[in-house]
Curated annotation (Swiss-Prot):
Highest taxon above the source species: Eukaryota
Protein name: Nuclear envelope integral membrane protein 2
Record key words, sorted: Membrane, Nucleus, Signal, Transmembrane, Transmembrane helix
Subcellular location: Nucleus inner membrane
Expression sites (tissue/organ): In the ovary, highly expressed in somatic cells.
Membrane topology: Multi-pass membrane protein
Amino acid sequence: MLPRLWWLVLWLQPLATLPASAVHDEEAAMSVPRCKSLKETDLIKTSVSDCYCYNQHSQIQWTYMWSTVQVTVTSPGLLNIVYITGSHNCQHTESILSFIKCVTHNFWAPEEAEEITIVFSPYGETVCFSVKPVGRLLPYIVSVSRNIVDFKLFLVFVTGIFLFLYAKTLSQSPVFYYSSGTVLGILMTLVFVLLMAKKHIPKYSTFGALMIGCWFASVYVLCQLMEDLKWLWYGNRMYILGYVVVVGLCSFAACYSHGPLADEGSRDLLMWTLRLFSLALVYTGVAAPQFAYAVLIVLLFSWSLHYLLRAFSYLRWKMRPWFTAEPQVARYLTDDEYREQAEAATARALEELRQACCRPDFPSWLAVSRLQAPKKFAEFVLGASHLSPEEVSTHEKQYGLGGAFLEEQLFSLQTDSLPAS
């Protein structure tokens, strides 16, 4: 049974912007009239703690589906970013998905750093933030740039499309099972260990709580390591390679001992997990939410179209006998029927020939000049038989009972039936 799609109501925002959220953004923007407006290609050098706002574009263009705006704040000293409005302020979010995205971003965003980069969509609500120094205020630089095509967004979008279209195939592939299990063991060891120990956890509620905790802990550790990846690679290259090799081999061995998914329920669970994950990737891989909704609707419709076509094919197969006549069975003629039809066809053709010869436009003299027996032809046109008594007698002797042709056929059959010496 297909699961219900009621969760789309909770996770997807409405296509139109909510009035309450728009009113809140306007009030927040009015409360900070002293904030400086940022534009693309701006480069601001200052030593005063101030706030800045980037006004989003109201007109959406499909050519900027994967474009992002990047604001970089650099200083010799430590800085802190405080969001005033925008999607990073989690007090007035429009949906559960927006709230989770906001909390996740604020949880993993660096609180204090010498260089802070803010990446957001050029469409949507106005983003306002203030720059707060940590300790003594030093000069800092605020630069604004726009990526026409953010390859990270495009890669996330393409990955989501691929996972959605090939979720069923991947869920049944042993290669995908082993490779994804190995990668999961390397990147998220806690989640991998919990999945391997699932049989020893009796309650699903306990397993779900542990899975959520392990998932967020693993993602948090992974994001923290990704920020310092260059430093870790240059200073601890051998340790990183050793960890990848050892944990990768252990993860592959655990997956190999467990074996690929055999029962249909586990495969369906993996397939639906991949599809839900792919929808989340498609939604986050597009800058404008309207384009994301359109792509999600097309994907869901294309997936449902397969089942509609199957139902239509089944109904057509069931209703086909009502509209299709039974095919006629061919029957061979007997010898008597064949002889009767041959005689009737011959008589009809001869009569048509007589009528054609009796027409005024028939070239009678030309026909007579080319015939060997003009008298016989004239008698035939006047109604006599087309065969003379001598011809009938010769035919009976040749093909009748006791004729030469019949005897030849009988002797040839007897010769073929004799065994070869």
